[in-house]
Amino acid sequence: MASKTNRRKFLQAAGIGVAATAAIQSTLPAAPAESTSAARRVKIIAISGSPRKGKTTAAALTTALEAAKAVDPERIETELIELADLKLNGNMAAGIPLEPGQQDDFPELATKLSAKDVGGIIVGSPVYFGSMTSLCKAFLDRCISLRMRQFALANKVGGALAVGAVRNGGQELTLQGIQAAMMCQEMVVVADGRPTAHTGATVWNSGKDDISQDEFGMSTVKNLGRRVAEVALRMAAGK
């Protein structure tokens, strides 16, 4: 009885009623069964929250995934997902259902992220006025449905990446927003690993859509990818 009461209070505090909760959960397919062979591998998924497809956030995440893959090429699989390719309605996080006949892409994305072979998730966003993009926020808000599914992202390793127009342009604030959402999912949040080892990957875009000249920023990107992979492998091995 106590657990049901606590859950009801949480949903009320989040602005989600019983009917709205059912609307959210009804859009999510059941988690697929995982094969024994798939369980031996660890998948790292990077999510680009930029509305500009294939630009600097995607490029930075690609570098992070390459660094993750290099940790153990035989066991690590990687995938980049760009939210710019998807239809996501952030209003559903507040329990506002889609119009009759409408669909969006979150249910398929939720199934992919919650799969047992996914050991790590890196979320990246450009910096917009010291915070993440509305697209990235809508995605993280929609992940409330995964929290409601017995914390489907729990114990997956999370990393955050931010690309700003100047060196100190709000990257760390953006990282903190992404990391806060991950912690609410019971994810294991890591930052960029040594030797930089601060709060995550912080990248500077000089305005020419070229981040390759940002040596320090790209080092944090590589360290983040490596660290996410290292911890995900340890988690998979039960260490």
Locations of regions flagged by a protein language model:
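N-terminal beta1-alpha1-beta2 submodule of the flavodoxin-like/Rossmannoid cofactor-binding fold
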Residues: 3-6, 11-149, 198-239
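Short, glycine-/small-residue-rich phosphate/pyrophosphate-handling segment
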Residues: 152-195
